Amino acid sequence: MSNKQKIRIRLKAFDHQVLDQSAEKIVETAKRTGAKVSGPVPLPTEKEIITILRAPHKYKDSREQFEMRTHKRLIDVVLPTPKTVDALMRLDLPAGVDIEIKL
């Protein structure tokens, strides 16, 4: 691969502990194969709040709120080698982590 290329990896998950473990696994794999790694950089957490009525009929003043937090991390693999790309493609990560890879 050329020297100007970099791989940008964005990770998303609802559980921040699983997300951090996955990010650490990616960084460790990339460093072991000889690539320079920048990150993991924590991105802002999205918080989606849903408000519903507690009662099925009336009592509008009684409501309940639920929230769903989406945690995100960004990892840049600078100067990736073909060995690095192959190792990252074969990496097994948990099911709760969404991965976006841009070359």
Swiss-Prot record:
Gene: rpsJ
Stored SMART domains: Ribosomal_S10 (SM01403)
The keyword Signal appears for this protein: no
Source organism, top-level taxon: Bacteria
Coiled-coil ranges from the UniProt annotation: none
GO MF annotation terms: structural constituent of ribosome; tRNA binding
Keyword Nucleotide-binding annotated: no
Annotated function: Involved in the binding of tRNA to the ribosomes.
GO biological process terms, semicolon-separated: translation
Matching Gene3D superfamilies: Ribosomal protein S10 domain
SUPFAM superfamilies per record: Ribosomal protein S10
Protein name as annotated: Small ribosomal subunit protein uS10
Alphabetically ordered keywords of this record: Ribonucleoprotein, Ribosomal protein
Membrane-traversing stretches: none
Family per similarity comment: Belongs to the universal ribosomal protein uS10 family.
GO cellular component: ribonucleoprotein complex; ribosome
UniProt-listed InterPro entries: Ribosomal_uS10, Ribosomal_uS10_CS, Ribosomal_uS10_dom, Ribosomal_uS10_dom_sf
PANTHER family: 30S RIBOSOMAL PROTEIN S10 FAMILY MEMBER (PTHR11700)
Lineage: Bacteria, Bacillati, Bacillota, Clostridia, Eubacteriales
Subunit structure as annotated in this protein's UniProt entry: Part of the 30S ribosomal subunit.
